[in-house]
Amino acid sequence: MNMVHKIMANEEAFHLLLAIIIGVIGGLVNMFFLNFVSLIQWLIFQNTGDSAFLAQEAKPFLRVLAPILGGILAGLILLLHSHLSGKKKPTNVLEVVALGDGRIGMRSTLISAWSSLISIGSGASIGREGAITQLTAAFASKWGQTHEWQPYRLRLMVACGAAAGLAAAYNAPIAGALFAALVLVGNFSMNLFAPLVMSSVVATMVSRFWFGIDPWYVLPESMNFDQATNFTSMLWFLILGITSGASGAFFLKSIQKMETISAKSPWP
């Protein structure tokens, strides 16, 4: 007990302890989410795997019908929730960490996660990392609200949840920690960065315990790394980076434009 009291008295050590627990939550969220996705895929396709594999193996009518019906059902869930719920708490992780007090709406997050589950399980080509990151951050926020943490601690733990969720989803602890530090917290000071790293590493360890250490994306066996690192290849990588950045900016602008148009439309 003396050790526990010492850890709780030292704020930085206490934050590391909280980060470890949130990392475990992130790994478990990833495990349950992906298993539910596999269950939905099996019910629809009698098969499991990524969207491309399912489309290749599925019957022709299912390739078209399953994503359409899944998208309609997922949209109806969100639409029904928006009509039945009153004033909703924010669910955007960046918003609650950078501008808010770290409070995330749990109900809205769970509804959004169910919608994502149905979309992904029915073959939609959307990323799983968004829902897993959001769910882990929401659980961290709910835990902190239950214990009445101060806003500065609550924001940090929500960022740890986002880092853990992303790290577990992609088996990438460094990416999870850097994402939270750069995008959410915007600070690399050790007292903030260390908990993010701890959550990411623990979440990845829990995820690897269940799914193994294999990477999500496998490079072709024919790839020659000596050729990939010569000067000519570097020029192509430079062009690829510029093109990817421009495409990403265009995509984000397009989303913002469509959100503006949708908000003005009377149609759901």
Describe the predicted segments one by one:
Residues 1-268:
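Alpha-helical transmembrane segments and immediately membrane-proximal extracytoplasmic
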